[in-house]
Swiss-Prot record:
Encoding gene per record: EXLA2
A GO biological-process term: sexual reproduction
Classification via SUPFAM superfamilies: Barwin-like endoglucanases, PHL pollen allergen
Ranges for domain Expansin-like CBD: 162-244
Expansin-like EG45 domain sequence ranges: 42-148
Superkingdom of the source species: Eukaryota
Tagged with keyword Glycoprotein: yes
Gene3D superfamilies: Expansin, cellulose-binding-like domain (2.60.40.760), RlpA-like domain (2.40.40.10)
Glycosylation sites: 100, 103
Secretion signal span: 1-21
Protein's name in the database: Expansin-like A2
Family of the protein in this entry: Belongs to the expansin family. Expansin-like A subfamily.
């Protein structure tokens, strides 16, 4: 079943990438910012209050084509505004934590991320905020968490041993997790988890004992399986995060024009 899924994924990616291979598709649009700090903790990805701790609070709501029914949660983008008087050429990096439901902008940033697009001169960030909505360029970039491994967080709704809900934290690379399989440690009997909403995956068929995971991710133009052999102990608890022991570093190729692989500085 896993092999069949990977083959189907590779076919879909191949036919959806008819343009030249590219790591950094460049997009032009507009960005606004959240005027209320409370909105940052209620994003559709269901990260809750943890969202404000990602990338020093540089987070964003993205349009549906980026959010992708939740598979875009945790994706990283480099974004810069285009006002030559106020904006730096480097911009800032944000992580997707929410769905942008408006059609006025591609991204809605936290005010901290919005200000970080400004030039490093006194008052530039304040003047940028006054603009409200600005023209931007943005591109997908790998999420870099240094030496930190990916974490599996057990949601508060989980009930050992009958129901398990998880979300992935600190997912590196430039990929999307499109499927998750779960099995008892040492077993070859895998069952699939279902994406419930946002970044949350669930199952009511929880194997007994300690648990291992297989994550199917986009990588290059194909699907790749990342195996985390021992993640959750038999006595796993709701509300706790567990080290997955692995990190994703792959880059999923895109097909687009224009492509921008230059360093922004």
């Amino acid at each position: 079943m896993l092999q069949g899924f990977l083959f189907l994924l590779s076919v879909v990616l191949l036919f959806s990438s008819s343009a030249a291979a590219c790591d950094r598709c460049l997009h032009s649009s507009k960005a606004a910012y959240f005027s209320s700090a409370s909105a940052l903790s209620s994003g559709a990805c269901a990260y809750g209050s943890m969202a404000t701790g990602f990338f020093a609070g540089h987070i964003a709501a993205a349009l549906p084509s980026i959010y992708k029914d939740g598979s875009g949660c945790g994706a990283c983008f480099q974004v810069r505004c285009k006002n030559p008087t106020l904006c730096s050429s480097k911009g800032t990096t944000v992580i997707v934590t929410d769905l942008n439901k408006t059609n006025q902008t591609d991204l809605v940033l936290s005010s901290r991320a919005f200000r970080a697009m400004a030039k490093p001169v006194v008052g530039a960030d304040r003047d940028l905020l006054k603009q409200g909505i600005v023209d931007i360029e943005y591109r997908r970039v790998p999420c870099d968490y240094g030496n930190k491994k990916m974490n599996v967080r057990v949601e508060e709704s989980s009930k050992n041993p009958n129901y398990l809900a998880i979300k992935l934290l600190y997912q590196g690379g430039q990929t999307e997790v499109v499927a998750i399989y779960i099995a008892q440690v040492g077993s070859s009997h895998w069952s699939y988890m279902t994406r419930s909403h946002g970044a949350v995956w669930v199952t009511d068929k929880v194997p007994n004992g300690a648990l291992q995971f297989r994550f199917v991710v986009t990588a290059g133009y194909d699907g790749k399986m990342v195996w985390s052999q021992r993640v959750l102990p038999a006595n796993w608890e709701a509300g706790k995060s567990y080290d997955a022991g692995v990190q994703i570093t792959d880059i999923a190729q895109e097909g687009c024009d224009p492509c921008d692989d230059h360093i922004w500085n």
